[in-house]
């Protein structure tokens, strides 16, 4: 196994099975963040993740963290909160604000550089990247974004500026996603937060099998149309 240098003249990726074991999942470096290359990466189960000043690094870890949306863990306190939620939740109303919120919400620094923001905004304009927004009146207080692959959603990042805002985004999205035929959410790498929400690890080969099946599936044509998903009770 060796790290592969990508060419700027080809969007081809090596097989994820050739990724390094340490650091887990590192597969390639270089290339660019063009829409064609990003879409090719997601179709192959690969995603970019790198620090400012570093070359673009491409990953496909084994195991892979996923969330079956019907297995989302909702605590009793969250259920009580959501029942009386003051938040309004929308889809694809403010993609730019959401990714900027994710970029600025990391005190320890972030991989969401200006180039990443611009790259995913292009994907959004092309109809591949999507956002969920959580509002308190007219203020954006949380949200999440990711990339659609048929009936699989590749979650990228989320942020929260008020109590339970990002959890509300995920809860409402999961309900909507399941209700329209969505099957699986890719969480990439398991951490304490995603594990507490019900995410689990599966072998990479299993994830790639799911991806190859689900990316050919279809949600309703109007699923990603900008709209309100949840409003607080009067």
Curated annotation (Swiss-Prot):
GO terms for cellular component: cytoplasm. One of its GO terms (molecular function) is leucyl-tRNA--protein transferase activity. The keyword Cytoplasm applies. The lineage of its organism: Bacteria, Pseudomonadati, Pseudomonadota, Gammaproteobacteria, Enterobacterales. GO terms for biological process: protein catabolic process. Keywords: Acyltransferase, Cytoplasm, Transferase. This is Leucyl/phenylalanyl-tRNA--protein transferase. The gene is aat. Belongs to the L/F-transferase family. Disulfide bonds: none annotated. It is an enzyme of class 2 (transferase). InterPro entries: Acyl_CoA_acyltransferase, Leu/Phe-tRNA_Trfase, Leu/Phe-tRNA_Trfase_C, Leu/Phe-tRNA_Trfase_N. Functions in the N-end rule pathway of protein degradation where it conjugates Leu, Phe and, less efficiently, Met from aminoacyl-tRNAs to the N-termini of proteins containing an N-terminal arginine or lysine. It is found in: Cytoplasm. It catalyses: N-terminal L-lysyl-[protein] + L-leucyl-tRNA(Leu) = N-terminal L-leucyl-L-lysyl-[protein] + tRNA(Leu) + H(+); N-terminal L-arginyl-[protein] + L-leucyl-tRNA(Leu) = N-terminal L-leucyl-L-arginyl-[protein] + tRNA(Leu) + H(+); L-phenylalanyl-tRNA(Phe) + an N-terminal L-alpha-aminoacyl-[protein] = an N-terminal L-phenylalanyl-L-alpha-aminoacyl-[protein] + tRNA(Phe). Its EC number is 2.3.2.6. The keyword Transferase applies.
């Amino acid at each position: 196994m060796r790290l592969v240098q990508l060419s700027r003249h080809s969007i081809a990726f090596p097989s994820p099975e050739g990724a390094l074991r340490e650091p887990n999942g590192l597969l390639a470096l270089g290339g660019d963040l063009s829409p064609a290359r990003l879409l090719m990466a997601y179709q192959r189960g690969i995603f970019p993740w790198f620090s400012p000043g570093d070359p673009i690094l491409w990953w496909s870890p084994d195991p892979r963290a996923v969330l079956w949306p019907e297995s989302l863990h909702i605590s009793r306190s969250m259920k009580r909160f959501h029942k009386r939620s003051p938040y309004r939740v929308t889809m694809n109303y403010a993609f730019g604000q959401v990714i900027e919120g994710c970029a600025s919400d990391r005190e320890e620094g972030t991989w969401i550089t200006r180039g990443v923001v611009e790259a995913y905004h292009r994907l959004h304009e092309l109809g591949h990247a999507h956002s969920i927004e959580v509002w308190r009146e007219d203020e954006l207080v949380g949200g999440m974004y990711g990339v659609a692959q048929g009936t699989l959603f590749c979650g990228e990042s989320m942020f929260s500026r008020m109590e339970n805002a990002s959890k509300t985004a995920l809860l409402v999205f999961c309900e909507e996603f399941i209700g329209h035929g969505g099957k699986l959410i890719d969480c990439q790498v398991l951490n304490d937060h995603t594990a507490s929400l019900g995410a689990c690890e599966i072998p990479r080969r299993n994830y790639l099998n799911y991806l190859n099946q689900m990316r050919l599936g279809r949600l309703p044509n109007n699923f990603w149309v900008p709209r309100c998903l949840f409003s607080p009770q009067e």
